Curated annotation (Swiss-Prot):
Residues 60-71 have a biased composition (Basic and acidic residues). Keywords: Ribonucleoprotein, Ribosomal protein. It comes from the Bacteria. Residues 48-59 have a biased composition (Basic residues). Pfam families: Ribosomal_S21. This is Small ribosomal subunit protein bS21. The lineage of its organism: Bacteria, Pseudomonadati, Pseudomonadota, Gammaproteobacteria, Pasteurellales. One of its GO terms (biological process) is translation. One of its GO terms (molecular function) is structural constituent of ribosome. Residues 48-71 are annotated as: Disordered. Belongs to the bacterial ribosomal protein bS21 family.
Amino acid sequence: MPVIKVRENESFDVALRRFKRSCEKAGLLAEVRAREFYEKPTTIRKREKASLAKRHAKRNARENARNTRLY
């Protein structure tokens, strides 16, 4: 869990913003959302495989667009 020390003469808003930023960097919110409900290992693998396929398709589309002649 991210911990921050409130500096002298630091407003609450600034300290809260620093805490939120440190939580975001640590990936705390994403971890909580991922663990909110149980997800079967097969579902996890399926989701990761789908995201990998999407990433590859995106990369291939960019490569094809780059190699297409415009004239």
